[in-house]
């Protein structure tokens, strides 16, 4: 059968208007919602090719001004692209008549979500068939759109309805709408609720004052998503969701920050962004008083007090505070790598790793530190780097009071108190505190050495060792001690050296109270108390507390004497013996 002809659509049909008295009944939230819905509708029509007129009503909408003095003077336009002739009349104190078939009732009922959602009203005496893709003008403002990009679908149509849809419609007056709005307020007793909301959902018990509202609510339980995007086939429950979704395809970002010019697809995101400029933090934790800009951050923070980790991995039993962390973790089990490089085809599990990899092709590092000139590809890396200059350490250990610049370092540190080592090697059973250590360890089994020196061709298992090696070619020692001017290749060496000047000994033995400057010395000392000797000689099975002692012992089997005296040519197996020998030559 041939497709039905497109019906004429009047722009007047998509405008909801009020008298001055009706406008006065609306609170600020309802007026704001009205403005957003109308502007959303206008933008949708424009994006679909409608030559929508922009009279004074629309001008006032865009500028957030009062609307009750505006009189509608709008002419018709068509989906087929006929030219519209805007007609603007002088503002008067009397406002336009409110259309009984408008969606005012829906706007008020849905004001809390601040979304323009399409209501499907039902009149028991009225069942209207509408041609597919063409909705009757005047039934609902959001339905009057061209069906080129959006379509309405329903799975349970009778055979004779294959070309039509059933639209449930009810006439709603402003008084009905305001009554429903008031009846949903706080302080109502159960009897009043039952009288005002006679239509009850059998699934969840929620009450509604109108039958059409109950029907629409029951779509949630039924899983009905009648609005489908013709670009990708995604289905949505509400028209407003389709409108927002379409911006993914069009790239439209209609909400622009007047402070910095950044644009957003949703007004909600703009509102949150503007708090960066205003410093507003409306979400405050009752436990500790910490305030947050975003509600999502506030909810995540609250979980640190409740210790709730609602996202549980069924594969390994690990639980997570955040759905994003859970989703990333699940990729470990599934092996899924969502982010693929268009240049070399390499795939990545995490978006941040993918972005960092892309820099190897583009060389782009847009985040510049004004203090030292260092650049970064990720804003998060830049933020962490800035803490070096500011000295900020936002992550403090509740056990020992030690503070950390990076969250990852803080998490690893906490495991020194708990003894937790959640990352286990499947080859040898060795466990690690963090995933990066496990990845590096796995290279022992695989023999992988991904870091190759372009100067000499030497390859390395660890990135840190590779960086240190590169400095042997450049001679660069970027870390200089301000006390004695000694320079170091590595930050770890620099940190250990600084303890000579400060006298800091952060590693304290719980058994005997002895303190150490270096973590390696602390670990070796602890083995005196535990009796642990993990390093065993394969030749004679003798065991040692540390790897250094094993290395020296192995020279008794190999005969290696790496320490040679420049004065007399004598060689030694141990550095201590070599140092003692040199004193013979230096004696006066």
Swiss-Prot record:
GO terms for biological process: regulation of transcription by RNA polymerase II. It is found in: Nucleus. Residues 9-80 form the KRAB domain. GO terms for molecular function: DNA-binding transcription factor activity, RNA polymerase II-specific; RNA polymerase II transcription regulatory region sequence-specific DNA binding; zinc ion binding. Keywords: DNA-binding, Metal-binding, Nucleus, Repeat, Transcription, Transcription regulation, Zinc, Zinc-finger. Pfam families: KRAB, zf-C2H2. Coiled coil: none annotated. A zinc finger (C2H2-type) spans 199-221, 227-249, 255-277, 283-305, 311-333, 339-361, 367-389, 395-417, 423-445, 451-473, 479-501, 507-529, 535-557, 563-585. The keyword Zinc applies. GO terms for cellular component: nucleus. The keyword Zinc applies. InterPro entries: KRAB, KRAB_dom_sf, Znf_C2H2_sf, Znf_C2H2_type. May be involved in transcriptional regulation. Belongs to the krueppel C2H2-type zinc-finger protein family. PANTHER family: ZINC FINGER AND SCAN DOMAIN-CONTAINING, ZINC FINGER PROTEIN 621. This is Zinc finger protein 599.
């Amino acid at each position: 059968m041939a497709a039905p002809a497109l019906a004429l659509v009047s722009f007047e049909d998509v405008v909801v208007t009020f008298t001055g008295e009706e406008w006065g009944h609306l609170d600020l939230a309802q007026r704001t919602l009205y403005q957003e819905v109308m502007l959303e509708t206008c933008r949708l029509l424009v994006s679909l090719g409608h030559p929508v007129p922009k009279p004074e009503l629309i001008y006032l909408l865009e500028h957030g001004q009062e609307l009750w003095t505006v009189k509608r003077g709008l002419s018709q336009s068509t989906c087929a692209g006929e030219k519209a002739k805007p007609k603007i009349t002088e503002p008067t104190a009397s406002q336009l008549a409110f259309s009984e078939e408008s969606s005012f009732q829906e706007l008020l009922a849905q004001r809390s979500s601040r979304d323009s959602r399409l209501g499907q009203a039902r009149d028991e005496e009225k069942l209207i068939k509408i041609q597919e893709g063409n909705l009757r003008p005047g039934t609902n403002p959001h339905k009057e759109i061209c069906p080129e990009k959006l379509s309405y679908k329903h799975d349970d149509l009778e055979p004779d309805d294959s070309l039509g849809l059933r639209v449930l419609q009810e006439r709603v007056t402003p008084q009905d709408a305001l009554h429903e709005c008031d009846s949903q307020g706080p302080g109502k007793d159960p009897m009043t609720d039952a009288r005002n909301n006679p239509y009850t959902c059998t699934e969840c018990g929620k009450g509604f004052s109108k039958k059409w509202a109950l029907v629409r609510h029951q779509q949630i339980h039924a899983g009905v998503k009648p609005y489908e995007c013709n670009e990708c086939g995604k289905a949505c429950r509400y028209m407003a969701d389709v409108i927002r979704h379409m911006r993914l395809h069009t790239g439209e970002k209609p909400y622009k920050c007047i402070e910095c010019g950044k644009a957003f697809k949703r007004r909600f995101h703009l509102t949150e962004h503007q708090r960066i400029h205003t410093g507003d933090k409306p979400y405050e934790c009752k436990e500790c008083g910490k305030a947050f800009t975003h509600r999502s951050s506030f909810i995540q923070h609250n979980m640190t007090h409740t210790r709730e980790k609602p996202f549980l991995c069924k594969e390994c039993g690990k639980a997570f505070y955040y759905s994003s962390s859970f989703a990333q973790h699940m990729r470990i089990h599934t092996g899924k790598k969502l982010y693929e490089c268009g240049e070399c085809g390499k795939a990545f599990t995490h978006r941040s790793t993918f972005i960092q990899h892309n820099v190897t092709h583009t060389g782009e590092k847009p985040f510049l530190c004004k203090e030292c000139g260092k650049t970064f590809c990720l804003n998060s890396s830049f933020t962490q780097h800035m803490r070096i200059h500011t000295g900020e350490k936002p992550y403090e250990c509740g056990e020992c009071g030690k503070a950390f610049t990076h969250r990852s370092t803080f998490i690893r540190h906490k495991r020194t108190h708990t003894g937790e080592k959640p990352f286990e090697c499947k080859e040898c059973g060795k466990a690690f505190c963090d995933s990066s250590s496990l990845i590096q360890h796995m290279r022992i089994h695989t023999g992988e050495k991904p870091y190759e020196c372009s100067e000499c061709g030497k390859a390395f298992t660890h990135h840190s060792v590779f960086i240190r090696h590169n400095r042997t070619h450049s001679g660069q020692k970027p870390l200089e001690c301000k006390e004695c001017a000694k320079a170091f290749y590595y930050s770890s060496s620099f940190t250990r050296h600084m303890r000579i000047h400060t006298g800091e000994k952060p590693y304290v033995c719980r058994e005997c109270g002895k303190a150490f400057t270096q973590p390696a010395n602390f670990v070796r000392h602890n083995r005196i108390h535990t009796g642990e000797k993990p390093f065993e000689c394969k030749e004679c099975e003798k065991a040692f507390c540390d790897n250094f002692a094993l290395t020296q012992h192995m020279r008794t089997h190999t005969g290696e004497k790496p320490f040679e005296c420049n004065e007399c040519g004598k060689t030694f197996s141990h550095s201590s013996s070599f140092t003692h020998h040199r004193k013979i030559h230096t004696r006066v």
